[in-house]
């Protein structure tokens, strides 16, 4: 299905649970328990943090963009996995903490004879990821595409 609209609107609702924890919901999707990461006050290891959600959003958006470009070019993706690591640091210009660099290591396995064509689509996949376009962080994708 082709994208027709030039504006897409999404919503989420957060409900505070006390302390530093909350639950995020959106429609009929499963609720997502959130808290700070363990290295911050009130952080919990068993809940998603905004930092981890951001990295997951980058990974999944890049994957979906890559899959769409592969499908459009009749390429068969047989396996796909990614691992993102991001650095948050205080920026010199405004002294605010922010993600400054994110590295995403992507492993994809294509049908025989399709790896080279898939490699040609990585720039488009990166360009068309809405989440990447929405951040000022330096996003470095390291693609490992095999057959």
Task: Tell where the protein language model's regions lie, with residue ranges.
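Extended beta-strand/beta-hairpin segments
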Residues: 1-56, 67-147
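Alpha-helical metal-binding/catalytic segments enriched in His/Glu/Asp
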Residues: 61-62
């Amino acid at each position: 299905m082709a994208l027709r609209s030039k504006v897409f609107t999404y919503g989420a609702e957060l409900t505070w649970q006390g302390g530093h924890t909350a639950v995020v919901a959106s429609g009929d999707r499963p609720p997502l328990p959130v808290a700070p990461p363990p290295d911050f006050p009130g952080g919990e290891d068993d809940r998603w943090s905004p930092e981890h959600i951001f990295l997951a959003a980058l990974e999944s958006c890049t994957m979906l963009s890559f899959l769409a470009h592969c499908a459009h070019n009749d390429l068969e993706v047989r396996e796909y996995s990614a691992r993102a690591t991001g650095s948050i640091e205080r920026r010199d210009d405004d002294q605010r903490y922010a993600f400054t660099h994110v590295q995403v290591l992507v492993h994809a396995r294509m049908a025989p004879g399709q790896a080279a064509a898939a490699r040609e689509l990585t720039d488009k996949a990166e360009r068309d990821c809405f989440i990447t376009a929405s951040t000022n962080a330096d996003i470095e994708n390291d693609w490992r595409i095999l057959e």
